[in-house]
Every structure is written in C-alpha cells, then in structure tokens.
C-alpha cells in the first residue's frame, strides 16, 4: 500500500511555519493570511527558487521524484493552484501576480482557524463539494489537471549556416472538409505545441506591393524559412526557399516607377531571409537594401508610427516572439484585450512610411504566418464553451482540429506556460 497523499492545507501550514521556502510566508500575526510567489514562467528573471512551493507540493504528493522524473514547473504550478482552488475555507484575498517587481498572491483562511490544520494529516485529499472560483484560471486547471505534458526538444540556437534541401513550392493548406476529431490526438498531447517543435514547417503567406498595388501573393512552407529575392538567378547555396518578387513591368505602367522598383530589386542581392527557431521568427538582410519592419494589422502597416526595427545585415535579428502573442491571445479570448497582431510588414530599400501613406513606398512586403492567423480566427469564433470549431495550424504534420472553446483556451495556457521569455539577441 502506497503512502497516502497529504492534504494541501495542513501541509501548507507546516511549510509556512517552517519558513524555508523563498517568498512563502505569513503576512499577519494572526496567521490567517499568507503569500505565495507567483512569477510567470515567461519572465526573463524567473529562477527555480520562484517555483519552490510548487516543487515541494509535487514531491509531497509523489507527482515528482528528483532523479527519476523530469522537472515540469508549469505542471507543478498548475496542480498546486488547482488543489488550493478546491479548498473550502480558503479564498484568494489579493492577486498581485501581475506586479512587475514582486508577483505574488495572498490567500486567506475564512471559515476555520489555522489551529485546525496545525497537525499533519495524511488522510486522502478529496475534491469535496467546496466552492470553486469561476475565474478562467480555474477552468483551465480543471481541464488540465490530469494531463501528462511531455517536454519539447531543445530547438537550439537560430542559424543560417546550412543550405536547405529543395522545398516544394507552393504548399497548399490541408482541406477543412474532414477535420481530425479531438480525441484522436491522444490524452497527453497538446496539439498547439507543434508550433514549437523543431523541423515543423510553418506556412507563410507572402504578399508584395509596388506603390501600394498588390503584385504578388504566394504561400510558402519550408523548414529553413524563406528568402525574398529580386532575381530568378540567385545564390542557391544560401538557406531559405527563394521567393522571387516579380518584375514591375508586369503590373506597372509608369516607366519612372518601374525603373526605381527594378533598382530596389537588384539591390536585394542574396535577399531578405526569414525563418523560425523555437518561439522566435528571425530575419537577416543578405543584400544591400536597407529594410525596416513592423508587426501590424493584416490590412495595412502601422505607417502612422515608426518601425519596430531595421533588419540587420550579416547577423540574425528577432522580429516576432510567439510568447507575448499567445499571452495577448489568451487575454483576447477572455474578452479583456484586443486581437494580437501577427502580420510582418517590410519596407524594402526606403525608410519606413512614418509620416507618409505606405502606398507611396516602392516595395512593401507583408508576411503572414498562417498558423497565427488561424489561432486568432479560432479565438474570434470561439463563442460559448460548448461550441466546437475547427482550427487548422497550417504547419507540417498537422491536420484540422475540432476543439471546444474551453479546450482551445486550455491548450493556449498550457503552451504559454511551457515557453521561455528570451530577448531576440539571446540563444
């Protein structure tokens, strides 16, 4: 017979009295209120000590045995939170988890004194019929409490060093006519984690504009990403699938504008490379054309403001982080934020159109990761939790999925808790 699982409240009181876990402490003399560190895993300054209470509970319940099991900080945190939320007589008094300097939560005993929990009690910890908070966080816990989440392989640092194998061009999206039912995915697999798996090919929709006129659109999928070039005859040893922008003579009539556009295209040289590594999209300029970029709306670039940056030459630069996008998407699904932006706009060969209409620029290119568009569309049509919708991730080895709104939100939360928050200059 195995060791009985301890009850969360007596165990927690004993940890508070010991005072050995970083940031876990009583906050009043009557010992009715206590604080728990609640730093999000996305924060750059997150340390293992910030998750000490969650690991201790995982060890106490037998969910984690050091040396045998792999550490899983997001799951520890989720299970601890779920155990607290089920407890009658305990309430969340203050939620300071968004505090930039000291994120934490303060809980309070309301129906019984601490003395009731002062002695260790190893009777089974059952769910009981206690009141449960109706926050989205608790709904996610109920959905994810019994899941076994496999860690992702280390994607390694971004690199442009290896020439790609030939990629089929273009690749069509899988049909939505026969979506794969959700149960076929397996009980422990979060399908959204495929977005981060090394080797999974993101699909990019590339649209080019000459003086505001759309002249080109193509959907590309290649493990090494893509490379915008201005000539069919390019350096095939460079990485990324070459996407050749069309000659302006095919769509423009003004000879002067045609001449300027051709000059810009000729200066692209090796091209503008864009690829994914981990949760980041990276870009690098391989030619002479200065290129500015911004993350904006699909319909038009954010021309009323300055660019987000300039694509660096001869080194990679981060242009999109999936982590904040997913955080904003979760907020959007909860109705408390705007739809996150995901379209990358590039102004090639000229300064960013900050004070002028973007249609005056010679060459503007929009790149949309179609998987991100699909995630936003799923959030928009989610509606009631009982409503099933279909989402197509538009990445390799994936098929359309039928998910309820609650399943979708739960998978988003699980995805973001497993991410790292890295600056674009870090690997």
Curated annotation (Swiss-Prot):
Residues 200-360 are annotated as: Interaction with HERC5. The modification Diphosphoserine is found at residue 386. Keywords: Acetylation, Activator, Antiviral defense, Cytoplasm, Disease variant, Disulfide bond, DNA-binding, Host-virus interaction, Immunity, Innate immunity, Isopeptide bond, Mitochondrion, Nucleus, Phosphoprotein, Transcription, Transcription regulation, Ubl conjugation. Transmembrane segments: none annotated. It holds the Pfam family IRF. The modification N6-acetyllysine is found at residue 366. The modification (Microbial infection) Phosphoserine is found at residue 175. One of its GO terms (molecular function) is protein domain specific binding. GO terms for biological process: antiviral innate immune response; apoptotic process; cellular response to exogenous dsRNA; cellular response to virus; cGAS/STING signaling pathway; cytoplasmic pattern recognition receptor signaling pathway; defense response to virus; DNA damage response. Expressed constitutively in a variety of tissues. Belongs to the IRF family. It is linked to Encephalopathy, acute, infection-induced, 7, herpes-specific: A rare complication of human herpesvirus 1 (HHV-1) infection, occurring in only a small minority of HHV-1 infected individuals. It is characterized by hemorrhagic necrosis of parts of the temporal and frontal lobes. Onset is over several days and involves fever, headache, seizures, stupor, and often coma, frequently with a fatal outcome. This is Interferon regulatory factor 3. The lineage of its organism: Eukaryota, Metazoa, Chordata, Craniata, Vertebrata. The gene is IRF3.
């Amino acid at each position: 017979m195995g060791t009985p699982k301890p009850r969360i409240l007596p165990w927690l009181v004993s940890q508070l009295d010991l005072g050995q876990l970083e940031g876990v402490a009583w906050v009043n003399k009557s010992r009715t209120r206590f604080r728990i560190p609640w730093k999000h895993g996305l924060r750059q300054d997150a340390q293992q000590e910030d998750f000490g209470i969650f690991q201790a509970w995982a060890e106490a319940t037998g969910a984690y045995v050091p040396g045998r099991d792999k550490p899983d900080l997001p799951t520890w945190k989720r299970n601890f939170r779920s155990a607290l939320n089920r407890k009658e007589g305990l309430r969340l008094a203050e939620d300071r988890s968004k505090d930039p300097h000291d994120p934490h939560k303060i809980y309070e005993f309301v129906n019984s004194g601490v003395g009731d929990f002062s002695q260790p009690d190893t009777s089974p910890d059952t769910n009981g019929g206690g009141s449960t908070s109706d926050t989205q966080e608790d709904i996610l816990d109920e959905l994810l409490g019994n899941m076994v989440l496999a860690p992702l392989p280390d994607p390694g640092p971004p690199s442009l060093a290896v020439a790609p194998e030939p990629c089929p061009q273009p690749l069509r999206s899988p049909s939505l006519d026969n979506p794969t039912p959700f149960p076929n995915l397996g009980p422990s697999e979060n399908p959204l984690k495929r977005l981060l798996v090394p080797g999974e090919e993101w699909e990019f929709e590339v649209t080019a504009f000459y003086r505001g006129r759309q002249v080109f659109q193509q959907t590309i999928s290649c493990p090494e990403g893509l490379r915008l070039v201005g000539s069919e005859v390019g350096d095939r040893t460079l990485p990324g699938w070459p996407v050749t922008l069309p000659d302006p003579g095919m769509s423009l009539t003004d000879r002067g504008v045609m001449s300027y556009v051709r000059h810009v295209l000729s200066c692209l040289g090796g091209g503008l490379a864009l690829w994914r590594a981990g949760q980041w999209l990276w870009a690098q300029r391989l030619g002479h054309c200065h290129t500015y970029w911004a993350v904006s709306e699909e319909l038009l670039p954010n021309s009323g403001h300055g660019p987000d940056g300039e694509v660096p030459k001869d080194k990679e630069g981060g242009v999109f982080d999936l982590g904040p996008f997913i955080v904003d998407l979760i907020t959007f699904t909860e109705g408390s934020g705007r739809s996150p932006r995901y379209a990358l706009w590039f102004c090639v060969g000229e300064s960013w159109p900050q004070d002028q209409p973007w249609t005056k620029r010679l060459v503007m290119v929009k790149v949309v990761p179609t998987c991100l568009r699909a995630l936003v569309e799923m959030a928009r049509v989610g509606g009631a939790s009982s409503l099933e919708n279909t989402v197509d991730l538009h990445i390799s080895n994936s098929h359309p999925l039928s998910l309820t709104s609650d399943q979708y939100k739960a998978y988003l939360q699980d995805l973001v808790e497993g991410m790292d928050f890295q600056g674009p200059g870090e690997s």
